[in-house]
Structure formats: C-alpha cells, structure tokens
Design a protein with these regions (language model features):
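Short hydrophobic/aromatic beta-strand micro-patches
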Residues: 35, 71, 109-111
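Conserved short beta-strand elements that form part of the metal-binding/catalytic scaffold
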Residues: 53-99, 139-162
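Conserved active-site tyrosine of GNAT-family acetyltransferases
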Residues: 42-47, 70, 122
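A cross-kingdom feature marking solvent-exposed beta-strand/loop segments within repeated
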Residues: 18-24, 29-30, 52-55, 62-64, ...
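Histidine-centered active-site/metal-ligand motif
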Residues: 31, 107, 147
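Vicinal oxygen chelate
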Residues: 2-25, 68-69, 77, 110, ...
Length: 166
C-alpha cells in the first residue's frame, strides 16, 4: 500500500470518511509492543535506564505470552505505554517473531472506542484484519490486528480497553 514512489489520491468523500473514522473511533496511541527474550531482564533494563515503571503484568495464555505494560513515571493516565512481551513457549507468535527478526518492536497499537464498528468499516474498505472476531488482550481488552501488508509493513493492533481502563 505504501510503496516508494506511490502516491495515493483521495476524493473529498474518502477524506471525510477517513477523518470521521480516525476522530470518532481511534482515540489515542495505546502502546508500542516490543518482543523480548526475557521479560524480567527487559523490565529491569527499562526501569534502570529509562526510569519506567510497571503498571500491569500478566500471563496471556491465549496469545502464549507473559507481558508487562510500562509507563514513564508521572505520565498522565491514558498516556501511551510500552508493552514488553516474552514467549511462554516456542509455538508463541512472539517466539516465532524473535526467531525470524530478533527482539524488537513487534507492533504499534491504537486505542479505539468501538472495535466492532471500526473493524466493519475497515473491512468495507478492503483492509484485512488478522482475526475474524476480536480476541482478549491485555487487562481484558478486546483486540484485533491490521495485516502489515495493508498498513505499510507495520503490524497495527487495535485495542478497545475494558470498560474500567483508560
């Protein structure tokens, strides 16, 4: 979609539709997901070198990961976070990512207000989502992913926080 030299021209109707989508349904950058081989070592590094603090830690069996959400100390509630993810076993998507690419940024996540409506609109525009239906994410959020081939090579996560989050 975003190849070099490619210029995408939108009609006024398309611009209006996309602006409404982003302002009404995408509310913030939620987090940057980083694949790490050892969660405890990564947490210590971010704390010791950048002063970040752990806001939440959990095991997500569905995704096959142990994860921690970190934030800058004193950041306002709802600020973007860093998600550190370590594989529970070699079958995990994160294990496969690290085997293929090494540790590093795995995805960029946006907070959304209505994942079902946004998913429907994206599909109507020909955007591929990885899951047919949303899955459980961190802290009981609902998530889905935009295929990297439809987002300039970036794995984009869409996160609808649980009702008591953010």
């Amino acid at each position: 979609m975003f190849s070099p030299g490619y210029r995408y021209v939108m009609t006024t109707d398309q611009v209006d539709t996309r602006r409404v989508l982003s302002t009404a349904l995408v509310t913030a950058v939620d987090h940057v997901g980083i694949a790490v081989p050892d969660l405890d070592v990564a947490i210590a590094w971010y704390h010791d070198h950048l002063g970040m603090i752990v806001l939440h830690e959990e095991v997500n069996e569905d995704q096959g990961i142990r994860e921690a959400m970190l934030a800058v100390r004193g950041a306002p509630k709802g600020s973007a976070q860093v998600q550190l993810m370590a594989a529970l076993d070699e079958t995990s998507t994160i294990a496969k990512f690290i085997d293929k690419r090494g540790p590093g940024i795995q995805q960029l996540a946006y907070r959304v207000s209505d994942l079902d409506t946004l998913s429907e609109r994206l599909r109507e525009q020909g955007v591929r989502l990885l899951y047919d239906a949303p899955r459980r994410g961190t802290a009981n959020s609902r998530i889905n992913f935009i295929h990297p081939k439809d987002a300039g090579g970036v794995l984009v996560e869409l996160v609808e926080p649980a009702s008591d989050e953010h």
